[in-house]
Amino acid sequence: MSDPRYQIDVSVVTRFLADQSQPEQNRFAFAYTITVKNNGLVPAKLLSRHWVITDGDGQVEEVRGAGVVGQQPLIDIGASHTYSSGTVMTSKVGTMQGSYQMKATDGKLFDAIIAPFRLAVPGALH
């Protein structure tokens, strides 16, 4: 069981960006909006991200970096941080998953898990 002091929940909304995609060149652009909510008992700062992006052909790309969209937000108890970003894939369908490294104000380092979510061109899945 995880420690209730360090409870970060991540929710994701995705969308296909037809105007930024070039299907004839196997270029499919997607945007995602992520909400990181602190349901724990201690404020926590989002230090870094780790993404595992898998396209429909099984190709895997890992992305690591500081913060999210240039920020390392401190998320208070009961508060949330929402941001939008995007990715380009070479297939109509893929998944993303990963984690955020967090640092609570009491000094504890912990990971907030980002459950797998699907990116798909509308109509690509039956």
Curated annotation (Swiss-Prot):
Transmembrane segments: none annotated. Gene3D superfamilies: ApaG domain. Signal peptide: none annotated. One of its GO terms (biological process) is error-free translesion synthesis. Pfam families: DUF525 (PF04379). Disulfide bonds: none annotated. It comes from the Bacteria. Residues 2-126 form the ApaG domain. NCBIfam families: PRK05461.1 (NF003967). This is Protein ApaG. It comes from Pseudomonas fluorescens (strain SBW25).
